[in-house]
Amino acid sequence: MEKKVEFLWLEGRETETLSLPAYETEGAAGMDVAACLDADCTIEPGDIVLIPTGFALAIPTGYEIQVRPRSGLAIKHGLTVVNAPGTIDADYRGEVGVGLINLGRQAVTIHHGDRIAQLVLAPVLQARWTVVTELEATERGAGGFGHTGV
């Protein structure tokens, strides 16, 4: 199933050599997104950097776009999306940026056009809170954080 998302390259950015976010395989859930940089960006271990993409989106109402790490960058270099998954709300119209953190032991340099994250379009359900005096009992109860073993 496809859903239309409006895409705008931002003026004054080096976007001519960039491609639209794209699914790399037929069964892919995420679209790879590239960095839009004026100069290389080196991320030292422990550092967090906001990488621009050079575009803005209009996401349909009732949807979000999740910003997720690329597995190869995470496994090979320790580079991941700092707030994974990040959320781009349907009413946001600014430039999409990707917050990356280097959890590895060596510096990682990002170049213009490098694929830095994945974008996943997902439906959104909004909650309606109901205040109650008691919750329905379950077998699990209040057990959490390791209650089923390691």
Swiss-Prot record:
Substrate binds at residues 70-72, 83, 87-89. GO terms for biological process: dUMP biosynthetic process; dUTP catabolic process. Pathway: Pyrimidine metabolism; dUMP biosynthesis; dUMP from dCTP (dUTP route): step 2/2. It is an enzyme of class 3 (hydrolase). Transmembrane segments: none annotated. Its cofactor is Mg(2+). One of its GO terms (molecular function) is magnesium ion binding. Pfam families: dUTPase. It catalyses: dUTP + H2O = dUMP + diphosphate + H(+). Its EC number is 3.6.1.23. Keywords: Hydrolase, Magnesium, Metal-binding, Nucleotide metabolism. PANTHER family: DEOXYURIDINE 5'-TRIPHOSPHATE NUCLEOTIDOHYDROLASE. Belongs to the dUTPase family. HAMAP family: dUTPase_bact. This enzyme is involved in nucleotide metabolism: it produces dUMP, the immediate precursor of thymidine nucleotides and it decreases the intracellular concentration of dUTP so that uracil cannot be incorporated into DNA. This is Deoxyuridine 5'-triphosphate nucleotidohydrolase. It comes from Desulfotalea psychrophila (strain LSv54 / DSM 12343).
